[in-house]
């Protein structure tokens, strides 16, 4: 979605492998999930890429990233899945004139939330927390929206963000082996909704949270009548797992809920006060995505 936001004058054009191009029209976008759908005008006979299953990915599995980094069309880089379910706070892609750095985090959609790094200067656009696939396949500005592909040629993620250390003098440093992709299963659900109605929904827990020590996400407030309240959760409770996924901090809980299907059932592992951890089944709500 941040690629559309960065389009100069709102003019969108798709360029295909054979060198032909066509104007494209926006079908819809979900800026929080950083997903957009566009439709190429007057084009037929295209062969779509096969979709993989991001739920079956394993750490260490080989993958390749495809895109147009720094304007170099058709670039393919290889690597592995470095981590799964990585909470990543992203922000829209800066224009070339804004990609001057001073150290810190920058990216395809700037990226925040990694200890010791600060956000690089860029145009302010909505931020979101992704439940991302981390890869060391080289990804650079211009890779946004390009596929992360497994060894069977199936797309398993959409490249969305990188961590990059600014060069300090002018210009932006390239890949340092920390790239992040949106899992394709999540992207497909959102894309299907955008195609059907032009709008997408997202799961809602109905809480505000903060980091808990030594780990977990503490509920600061619980909204009456929403999913968490209906499940009996209370302010002060600490969530340490969503299903089998560990929650290390507040971003981890936000990312896990953002990646869940609206209306789905999840099991939270919760600690209340000095009590022992216990599980709480929750039926997530559904709200329109931004």
Label every PLM stretch briefly.
Residues 1-290:
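Extracytoplasmic/periplasmic mature domains of Sec-exported, cell-envelope-associated bacterial proteins
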